[in-house]
Amino acid sequence: MDDNKSKALQAALSQIEKQFGKNTVMRLGDNTVQAVEAVSTGSLTLDIALGIGGLPKGRIVEIYGPESSGKTTMTLQAIAQCQKAGGTCAFIDAEHALDPQYARKLGVDIDNLLVSQPDHGEQALEIADMLVRSGAIDLIVVDSVAALTPKAEIEGEMGDSHMGLQARLMSQALRKITGNAKRSNCMVIFINQIRMKIGVMFGSPETTTGGNALKFYASVRLDIRRIGQVKEGDEIIGSETKVKVVKNKMAPPFREAIFQILYGKGVNQLGELVDLAVQQNIVQKAGAWYSYQGNKIGQGKNNVIRYLEENPQISTEIEAVIREQLLTKASDQTAAHDETEEEPDLLES
């Protein structure tokens, strides 16, 4: 760049900085650009599939799937992990279905969890935006998009048509929340439900509620499905769950994670820790015996899990080694491009 252009650029940057504040415009290679912080999902397998060790702070995340697939469980686990790291969390319960006792069992500090049960969609999204702008919240969960009923629909008659009202509401809210979330480094997780498109002959007939806006604004989209049952004898004690990373602006997408969700306990964290440790040869398996650093730690997987429960420092040590090995591999791959996406059709519902 010649001197005149360089001086003109410097003058423009100084003016922008004076008017809008420091770091409004930065060079992409500047050291001031920080790596994205991540909040663990509570599942080590899913953290690795996401490529950055969890869900990204300061971004919009969508978790969707069929009923009883583990969507709320996943978000409550993320809240528990965020609170353990010293974060403050909020839960906007538009479905009016949050169970405090279940949340406590999953490790959520319910005494310090902010909860709102809004009357209508506008109120829910306004509360979310105000909490984001406060700069004091690290993680907000909105459960769910389908329950964000516009005020006009609540106040209207039962048979009234309100075409595209919820889609327009979501698009307007996300335009505000996305930028505010980035500035305050607050993650906003939207739980969403699945609907069927009528008359689809080819491709998947499934779609999510609330229009297209959330698909565009979300940095991470997770599709969660129950694929089997976990049994102890004849008793069903949990479900086998598969999560597909459908969209990821932070790392390569389309990875999958399979793990168990145990009823009343949440993700079987120690079970997947043992499996990954054996897979990475951190824990050696010979027949039914498992050994770590030359010492036998149990015969059979259940005994190893019991040993790790009694020795949490060893499970923490093993987890740190797994994260170091697998997340380094993930970060070496080319990240997905964070393309500029066009504004979605507001009226599509």
From Swiss-Prot:
Subcellular location: Cytoplasm
Residue spans crossing the bilayer: none
Alphabetic keyword roster: ATP-binding, Cytoplasm, DNA damage, DNA recombination, DNA repair, DNA-binding, Nucleotide-binding, SOS response
Gene Ontology cellular component terms for the protein in this record: cytosol
Coiled coil: none
Any GO BP annotation: SOS response
Gene3D superfamilies: P-loop containing nucleotide triphosphate hydrolases
Keyword Membrane: no
Binding site for ATP: G65, P66, E67, S68, S69, G70, K71, T72
Classification via CDD domains: RecA
Top-level taxon of origin: Bacteria
Keyword Amino-acid biosynthesis among UniProt keywords: no
Cystine pairs: none
Bias (Acidic residues): 339-349
GO terms for MF: ATP binding; ATP hydrolysis activity; ATP-dependent DNA damage sensor activity; damaged DNA binding; single-stranded DNA binding
PROSITE patterns named among the record's database cross-references: RECA_1, RECA_2, RECA_3
Main subcellular localisation: cytoplasm
Region (Disordered): 329-349
Described function: Can catalyze the hydrolysis of ATP in the presence of single-stranded DNA, the ATP-dependent uptake of single-stranded DNA by duplex DNA, and the ATP-dependent hybridization of homologous single-stranded DNAs. It interacts with LexA causing its activation and leading to its autocatalytic cleavage.
Family according to the record: Belongs to the RecA family.
NCBIfam families: tigrfam_recA (TIGR02012)
Descriptive protein name: Protein RecA
